[in-house]
UniProtKB/Swiss-Prot annotation:
GO terms for cellular component: membrane. The gene is NPF4.4. The keyword tRNA processing does not apply. Expressed in shoots, roots and stems. Keywords: Membrane, Phosphoprotein, Transmembrane, Transmembrane helix, Transport. One of its GO terms (molecular function) is transmembrane transporter activity. The chain crosses the membrane at residues 44-64, 82-102, 113-133, 160-180, 198-218, 228-248, 337-357, 386-406, 420-440, 453-473, 493-513, 544-564. PANTHER family: OLIGOPEPTIDE TRANSPORTER-RELATED. It is a multi-pass membrane protein. It comes from Arabidopsis thaliana. The modification Phosphothreonine is found at T112. InterPro entries: MFS_trans_sf, POT_fam. This is Protein NRT1/ PTR FAMILY 4.4.
């Protein structure tokens, strides 16, 4: 009988694995079992949210104005400066996978944050020292001058810059997934409403950090110097560490569970080894670890990647088999979930490529516009990125207070709309951000070249505003989606995939810039300037590049619709809701004996 027969048999039984619930696993900072009256809850989460706001404030002040520093102070060409910034931010997000791995496997989220918080502070201090000491920078020079050749930073000067950025990237990257997972761990997984509210609150803290960074801290960098600005980032990060440590006695901590990659590898090896076997209809032939635990977690059968089901088939006549030849149902399900979310993850890469433009070319776009509000007051171009966060400071509470309860009544979903619907809404809106950017850049360029008039910097506000709204949907939806689909042993790692999407988006931006320059150069070899090949945006065709991104984003939205439907059609997509219902039934005494239940994979 084949795998389909096994799934049909499973449909007639209630299915459980032997994994403990997260509530049973959590301990305090001394390793003792948590007490609901003392540990976790909103009080503990507030300390984590404070750390989130301070850390975002520190890294955003550096990342969002970094292109100005490397262009004006390090004298890198504009395209190289843009690529350095996108590569830096991409590396920050890519290293989130390392942070998630170390947390889930060895350190736990709290210890991981303590270690890498110190590393990030050291990077900010090194940046401040370089910006302060003239001997660590090339001679001052006006990069916009057409008659002077500015000396680009090289040797030990460039090495100092790269070392500082690597420290910041390593620290911030390894922190990001753990902030979210550690904060979410302060609530019980069955409490979907509080979890959803936490994710919205985390984005609110993120927005507050961004807003202060893009206004106050960027103003400090502009008027007091980059050395003072980087020093302030170090001080702000230190304040965040104080907030994190202050909540130590209140935290629920999930202990590390050992290497998360070994069980995944075991599933593939076992499935390949037993590739010629046929799945039996008798569920007793499927391996489950023996356990005396009362709390169990349900798994729904997935018809996707059915070849992996063979990894948990018992071989007749063998009492004991190697874990590389026989895996548990939970292991197989965990691998299926990991493979199933990859297409959703991939569909958000273009979205983050658009974000990269708002932190690089759009800042330079603002530098080519009239930044004066009054005769004496100017807006730093990097502060333009604060516009969406000013709006979101008001939108996020309104979304949580009014939209979610209304949508909850209409849809029956505890989050108002499902995470997949929330992601799709954001992807749809992101296209219009690039449409607005292209239209404004075309008008800005024509006004300067034909009339010698500089448009007001407020003309580029719509592209930031629209993308800010789209990010409220996609970013929060993606974090909530990955966290809810993760197994208890992979919470930080799977949450890190959210940030890995940012990483790939920024790396793709660098590839697109280089490719577009080469393809659009007059002879195709890159020896003559392409759309983005000059240091002067009035000579470049940034508007064409924005139209290209708008087209890619529009196509990507329909690609996402296909994959989200593919994912939602599988019964295992309701895994988290089933888990919650089962745990509630256990607590109410509705399930008396889980040892007689049949497994489902």
């Amino acid at each position: 009988m084949d795998v389909h027969d096994l799934s049909e048999e499973a449909k007639r039984g209630v299915i459980h694995t032997s994994e403990e619930s997260l509530d049973d696993l959590c301990v305090d900072f001394r390793g003792r079992p948590c007490r609901p009256s003392k540990h976790g809850g909103t009080r503990a989460a507030l300390f984590v949210l404070g750390f989130q706001a301070f850390e975002m404030m520190a890294i955003a002040a550096v990342g969002n104005n970094l292109i100005t520093y490397v262009f004006n102070e390090m004298h890198f060409p504009l395209s190289k400066s843009a690529n350095l910034v996108t590569n830096f931010i991409g590396t920050v997000f890519l290293l989130s996978l390392l942070g998630g791995f170390l947390s889930d496997s060895y350190l736990g989220s709290f210890r991981t944050m303590l270690v890498f918080g110190v590393i990030e502070i050291s990077g900010f201090i090194l940046l401040s020292v370089q910006a302060h000491l003239p001997e660590l920078r090339p001679p001052e020079c006006n990069m916009k001058s057409t008659t002077i050749h500015c000396v680009e930073a090289n040797g030990y000067k460039a090495a100092t810059l790269y070392t500082a950025l690597c420290l910041v990237a390593l620290g911030s990257g390894c922190l990001k997934p753990n902030i979210i997972s550690h904060g979410a761990n302060q609530f019980q997984r069955k409490d979907l409403r509080k979890l959803s509210s936490f994710f919205n609150a985390a984005y609110f803290a993120f927005s507050m950090g961004q807003l202060i960074a893009l206004t106050l801290l960027v103003w400090v960098q502009t008027h007091s110097g980059m050395d003072v600005g980087f020093g302030v980032s170090a001080a702000v990060m230190a304040a965040g560490m104080i907030s994190l440590v202050a909540g130590t006695s209140f935290y629920r901590n999930k202990p590390p569970s050992g290497s998360i990659f070994t069980p995944i590898a075991q599933v593939f090896v076992a499935a390949i080894t037993k590739r010629k076997q046929i799945c039996p209809s008798n569920p007793n032939m499927v391996h489950q670890p023996s356990t005396d635990l009362v709390r169990v977690k349900p798994l729904l059968h997935s018809n996707k990647f059915r070849f992996l089901d063979k990894a948990c088939i018992k071989t007749q006549g063998k009492a004991m088999e190697s874990p590389w030849r026989l895996c548990t149902i939970e292991q197989v399900h965990q691998v299926k979930i990991l493979l199933s979310v990859i297409p959703i993850f991939a569909c958000t890469i273009i979205f983050n490529t658009i974000l990269a433009q708002l932190q690089t070319f759009s800042v330079q776009q603002g530098s080519s516009m009239n930044t004066h509000i009054t005769k004496t007051f100017q807006i730093p171009p990097a502060s333009l990125q604060a516009i969406p966060y000013i709006i979101l400071i008001f939108f996020v509470p309104l979304y949580e207070t009014f939209f979610v309860p209304l949508a909850r009544k209409l849809t029956g979903n505890d989050s108002g709309i499902s995470p997949l619907q929330r992601i799709g809404t954001g992807l749809f809106l992101a296209t219009f951000s690039m449409v607005a950017a292209a239209l404004v850049e075309k008008k800005r360029r024509e006004s300067f070249l034909e009339q010698n008039v500089m448009l007001s910097i407020f003309w580029i506000a719509p592209q930031f505003l629209i993308f800010g709204l789209s990010e409220m949907f996609t970013a929060v939806g993606l974090v909530e989606f990955f966290y809810k689909q993760s197994s208890q042993s992979m919470q930080s790692f799977l949450t890190a995939m959210t940030y890995c999407s940012y990483s790939f988006g920024f790396y793709l931006s660098s590839v697109l810039v280089s490719t577009v320059n080469r393809v659009t150069s007059s002879n195709g070899s890159g020896t003559k300037e392409g759309w983005l090949g000059d240091n002067d945006l009035n000579k470049d065709r940034l508007d064409h590049f924005y139209w290209l991104l708008a087209s890619l984003s529009f196509i990507n939205f329909f690609n996402y619709l296909f994959w989200s439907r593919w994912y939602s059609c599988d019964p295992s997509a309701t895994h988290h809701s089933a888990e919650v219902n089962s745990l509630e039934a256990l607590e109410n005494g509705e399930i008396k004996d889980s040892t007689t239940e049949k497994p489902r994979i």
